[in-house]
Amino acid sequence: MAMASPINGGAARERVLTPEILTLAAVVVLGSIMTILDATIVNVALATLGRDFATSISTIQWVATIYLLAFASVIPLTGWASERFGARRVWLASLGMFMLGSLLSGLAWSVGSLIAFRALQGIGGGMIMPLGQAILAQAAGPQRIGRVMSIVGVPMLLAPIFGPVIGGALVDAASWRWIFFVNLPVGAAAFALAARLLPEAKARRHERLDLFGLPLLSGGIAAFVYGLSEVGSRGSVGDAVPLVAVLGGLALVTLFVWHALRTARPLIDVRLFGERGFATAAATNLMLGIALFGMLILLPLYFQIVRGASPLETGLLMVPQGLGAALAMPVAGALTDKVGARAVVPAGVLVAVVGVIAYTQVAADSPSWYLAGALFAIGLGLGATIMPSMGAAYTGLTHAQMPRATSAINAIQRIAGSLGTALLAVVLQRAIRGELPRFHGGLAQAGALAARDPEHAPAALASAFGTTFWFALGLTVAALVPALLLPKRMPA
């Protein structure tokens, strides 16, 4: 009888998702899901917050925007912090800061205090998921990276769907304060488990913070995202405030790239883009993030403004996307480990294209099965593309490069989502004005108009949404180019 060689046996063990790896992934998911939920859970409560604090929607929107800005700004610190202090220690500290921000947000006494505490939440939350991904990438190794990334990607795709559902239910049943307090028991459980189960990582005490690169990159990202959000809210590219912010942000990021190429240990190693796997994965994530995550922010507005759905009903209408993603992710992860990202991701992009095409034809009275089926297809496409392409980003990288690669790819994803939201909001605003030339209000006024003129306004608004989704379709199709250049197989 032939005996399996120790080498082959070891290789087989390296491909198996052991209980230790699965437990580690569960802890990371538990901590990460709250931070992603909080990017969307507050959206359904903005009107209530505006009434309670007697302030305008233009002011109260910063409760949502400041979290995103703080979240994106600290991601570049992840690589340095994990190397300087150890990933486990920084993960626990970040979770503790996020929980403190949640507690204080729930106790907020004014709109100013709530915005400040949401910023604290974002600073803590921004590092949790990329740190967890780096820990898992190092523990899993190249033979299991696709399946592990699919597991940890669950909160990224499911939380934005269930966030509005949970938020709407909590606001209706209790109070807006509970959308923040709900994080505390989950966070406490994640903290206790992580303190016991996350592996200790040797800190590199000699690592120094890139003090010159920090304000350039973090400040540039913050200014750029702020400018884009202002373009979306003001509906004008030429307005001085967003224009200066966007151009200033681009200038700071450009200066950072120049600095990083001349520094031994920059905050984000831009030399990673010289690796084909990382560069193509980053480009794929950027295009899909702009198109699909931006679109998924606008779809709830379509349901509420055009079809008159409540916040809770809207959250439930978005569930098919989450189901599609949940079904596709484990299958795509297993296939990626076997045949490589290049064979999986383009197929996922094509499935997403089918769903987006359906929404370009959307009407005010489109049947529910049509909308649900299209969302399910978009979810399948997202589940088969985002995390497999993230796994491909590690191809060709050394063990030591993985933490910095993780922070870079996560920053790209968050920026892409912000960029997509702002750009599609501008397209939507202009499309609405094209359909309704006498309309000069915002999206809230658009909803009131649909209620006042149910015979004509909903159809015109639905047409504006369809026009906007054509823009998303173009970006989704364009993502096929870098997707077809992804690595064929993970290295052995």
What are these regions (language model features)?
Residues 2-32, 258, 277, 391, ...:
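Transmembrane-helix exit segments and adjacent C-terminal regions of multi-pass membrane proteins
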Residues 172-184, 230-242, 310, 430-473:
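A membrane-interface helix-boundary motif in multi-pass transporters
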Residues 20-77, 113, 153, 175, ...:
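Transmembrane core module of solute transporters
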Residues 49-50, 81-82, 166-174, 228, ...:
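Interfacial helix-cap and linker-helix signal at transmembrane-aqueous boundaries
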Residues 68, 75-213, 239, 408:
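Helix-loop-helix hairpins in multi-pass membrane proteins, especially solute transporters
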Residues 13-16, 22, 143, 191-218, ...:
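Flexible interhelical linker loops that connect adjacent transmembrane helices
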Residues 185-202, 219-230, 248-262, 480-487:
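C-terminal membrane-cytosol helix-exit motif in multi-pass small-molecule transporters
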Residues 77-79, 83-96, 104, 109-113, ...:
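C-terminal module of multi-pass small-molecule transporters
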